Amino acid sequence: MSHSFHLKDTGRIRLCGHRGNSLVAPENTLAAIRAAHAEGATSVEIDTVLSADRQIVVLHDLLLDRTTDGKGAARAKTLAEIKALDAGSWFDPRFAGERIPTLAEAIQLAHELDMVIEVEIKEKVDLEAYYSALALVLADEADRGRVMMISFDHTSLKEVKSRIPGLRTGGIVHERFSDPVAVARMSDLDELCIDLDVFDPSHAEALHAAGISIRCHAYKPRTWEMAGQAGLDWDRRLPEWLRSGLIDTLSGDDVRWLADFVGKSTGTPFPPTGHRQG
C-alpha cells in the first residue's frame, strides 16, 4: 500500500516533525519520532548516512561529534560501533542511552505509528554504496509505500528513483524558479520542498495541477518571531496558503507549536495522540 503525500487524498495537511520532534527530544532518534507522533504528526523528516559496513543510519552530520559521545566520521565506524554510542545525553540526561537508529528501524517505527517518513540523503562520499544499501532496505513494497526520499541533489534523486521501482522523491529548493514544474519534471520528482521565503501561490497551484505535492518548513518558533520582526509577514500569509490547500505537508522542529498554528489557521484541531516527552 502506498500512502499519499497529497492533501487532496489525505483530507488534512500532514504535520511533519523535522528530525522528529527535535525541539523536545534528541534529533534523528526513535524517541524524537515517537515524540512527533505524540503531538499529532503523521510524518517525520530524518537524515541518513552510511556506516563503514554500508548500513544506512539516521544521522544529520557526517561526523558523530555533535549528537553523540563519539568522535569522527560515521562512515569510519561499523554499525555495531555506532550502536554503542549514546545519542541522547547531549540533548538531555533523560535521554541517556538513546541510540542512533538504522533507517530500517525508523521505517519499522513509522509502520507501528502509521506515519510516513521523508528520508534525506546526506551521504556525500559513496553514493553508489548508498543506493545499493537503500535498495535492500526498501525491498518491501510496504516500506517504499511510506517513504519519500528527499535531497538538495536532484540528480541523485533521479538516479535512485531509476533504480528502485515505485520510489517517490522530493527535491529541496531554496530558490524561486520561473517554472518549478519544469524543475520537478527534469528530475522526475514527486514533491518539492519549498522554503517559505520563496513560496509562490501561483507556483503551488501549477505544481498541484501537475500532480506534484508540496512541503514547506516552518522553522523554530524563535526564527518565526524574528521573521515577523523583519517584515516577512508569515503570520498572515501562511494561514491563507493553508486554508487554500496550497501546502500538503508542513514541517517544523516543535510539532505541538506547529499543530496549534495549523489548527488555528484552518479550524481543524490536531490534538496530541499520546504521551508527551518531558
Language-model regions, residue ranges each:
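Phosphate-group recognition and catalysis centered on beta-loop-alpha active-site segments
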Residues: 1-278
